[in-house]
Design a protein with these regions (language model features):
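Histidine-/acidic-rich catalytic cores in large beta-rich domains
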Residues: 1-162
Length: 162
């Protein structure tokens, strides 16, 4: 399954292959020019979408201006930033945020101020659906409306106020 694809500034395409647990970058002719397999970090797979599940079924990947790739690891409950050499240089894990549990981390975005915004799907009624964090993993703000959206908010577009 392919969850989403983004065209990069260089004209290639960055594609999140959920079932394979791999981000692949394709050139304009469809040839793979880079790929990154999301690791299991020494853990065993556990099926499902809830916070108790675990795997590497990533949901999203975006290329950052510095050339690194920001990845929403899906049921890996994390956000990772990896270099072109495949080194993890930043990671937000399931229980890094005080009072918040990450579940199926879907859409991710690095904001111009350096903060990271992520969508936290399938996290249950006690956790926010959208979270913005600083590079130091401090929560800036959250959106939490389980009554309206439940566990079914895999993507969100947050626009600036006019």
């Amino acid at each position: 399954d392919t969850r989403n694809a983004h065209k990069t500034a260089s004209g290639s395409y960055l594609v999140a292959h959920e079932r394979d647990g791999v981000v692949r970058e394709y050139d304009a002719k469809g040839s793979v020019i880079w790929e990154y397999a999301v690791p299991l970090f020494g853990r065993e797979r556990a099926g499902g979408h809830s916070p108790e599940a675990f795997g590497n079924q990533l949901y999203s990947a975006v290329r950052l201006p510095n050339g690194n790739t920001l990845i929403g690891t899906g049921n890996g409950h994390s956000v990772i930033e990896v270099t072109p050499e495949k080194e993890i240089v930043w990671k937000l894990e399931q229980n890094d945020l005080d009072g918040i549990t990450l579940a199926w981390v879907t859409q991710v975005e690095r904001l111009p101020n350096g903060n990271t915004r992520l969508v936290n799907c399938h996290a249950g009624p006690d956790n926010p659906q959208i979270i913005e964090v600083t590079p130091a993993k401090q929560v800036v703000w959250t959106f939490h409306d389980f009554d309206t959206f439940g566990n079914s908010m895999p993507v969100a577009l947050v626009l600036p106020a006019e």
